[in-house]
Amino acid sequence: FKNLTSILEMLWNIEKDLNLVSYNETEKKIYYIIAWKLSNCGTCNISDVIDSSGFSRSTVYKTIKKFELADLVIVKQSEGDKREFNLILAN
């Protein structure tokens, strides 16, 4: 039980450091997917997030827009495919 408490406290501190405390679980999952994709693949686009998350296109777009307005994520149009947008973490 003590280990679980320590892990939850660590997670809370990470979310505080990343300014994610005020977001719901869906929004946090989308943020973590972006971070994971960038860390493992070097790139992440909106389609990657939709495919990986299982959330609707609308939910992903609304959340990314929310992150963009909060300066958590930068959205850049892909040079290779003008219909696609690449995501960059602002932190």
Placement of each model-derived feature along the sequence:
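Short alpha-helical segments that sit at the start of domains
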Residues: 3-33
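Short, cationic-aromatic polyanion-contact patches
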Residues: 21-26, 45, 78-91
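Short helix-capping/hinge SLiMs at alpha-helix to coil transitions
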Residues: 36-41
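A short alpha-helical element within helix-turn-helix/winged-helix DNA-binding domains
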Residues: 42-54, 67
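Short coil turns linking two alpha-helices in DNA-binding domains
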Residues: 56-59
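Residues in the recognition helix of alpha-helical DNA-binding motifs
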Residues: 63
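A short, conserved structural fragment
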Residues: 68-78
